[in-house]
Amino acid sequence: MNEIRAAALSDHLYNKAAFRRIPLSGTFELSPLCNFACRMCYVRKTPQEVRAHDRPMLQFGDWLRIAREGREQGLLFLLLTGGEPLLWPRFWELYGELVDMGMLVAINTNGSLIDDEAIARFRRRPPRRVNITLYGGSDGTYERLCGVRGVFSRVDRAIRGLKAAGISVKLNCSLTPDNAADLEAMVAYAKELGLQLDLAHYMFPPIRRDPSAIGVNERFTPAETARSRVRGIELQQGMDAARAFLERVKGGCAEPPGLEEGCYDPVDGRVRCRAGSASFWVTWDGFVTACGMMPQPRVELEGRPFADVWRELTEATAALRLSGVCARCENRLLCHPCAAMAAAETGSTEGVPQYLCHVAKALRRMADEI
């Protein structure tokens, strides 16, 4: 019941914040550096690439200033991400300052750097939640997808250690052809530990990392994405739930795949994106964007009060337009196209993301077979 009440309260706050253009939620992308080299990553850079970049990484004082000025504007929920945020040199110092500031801080991490000392630090200053991305169910899968050896056992120890310490943990999983064979094992693992596992079957083209990657990523074909979605529901909720999902598909309305929390309304399933109206994302090199999956709109942060930056971002976001084709499509409540998806798939928020069209059609075909 507490979780239900918390979710309802959070939704109420977000709705009010979006109406009043209050930056209730923010993401701090501390660094593009990561000890993994996942093939589908949208942001990762090597140290050499960071040094060659035309803008420096934000520093400790920069992040503190943004947090303090953001708090004055209504910032409460804060997500620390990367890259791998625990690699950032002053992570623990910044984390402590943010928690002491009254922020409700969550962390996105691959979990490989969470040892006993890290767990002890989290116990002293508990985060709102630690989100750990599970990339497979074995060391071999991690090596194939992430380019790292002997890591799954470390991640497993971290997850079990956090849970034993009473730290809130959620598992995320980005499904690709390289780890699809582990889906059943990952679902079983989450059930064994009694943890939520969110499956993302859709991989955004990494246009922030590589502007030429429009419509391209290490991902499933549309038909494979459709099958993966149904299989995930079957494994997590049972055959009856999978059949009910396909019945909703047949009716033309089903919950969207792989979107972040808060992207869609849990009542009617419609995408109600809060990016740029109640939430923001700060990139490692000092831009404020509406969403981390798209490079535009973005606002220069350096030397400007956060209040001015936020105002400019809300105006730029409100001016975004999606394709009228999508708005009229009979499958619009199956693929749920958003501005970030359209931009990543076509290069424009007004483009028609054909990949999603094909996923929706594949789901329709599956639904017609039941």
Role assignments for model-derived ranges:
Residues P85, L113, L175-D178, Q296:
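Short histidine/acidic/glycine/proline-rich micro-motifs that form metal-
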Residues F19, T27, L195, P211-I214, ...:
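Accessory C-terminal segments flanking Radical SAM cores
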Residues A37, G74, P126, L193-Q196, ...:
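Short loop/turn motifs at secondary-structure junctions
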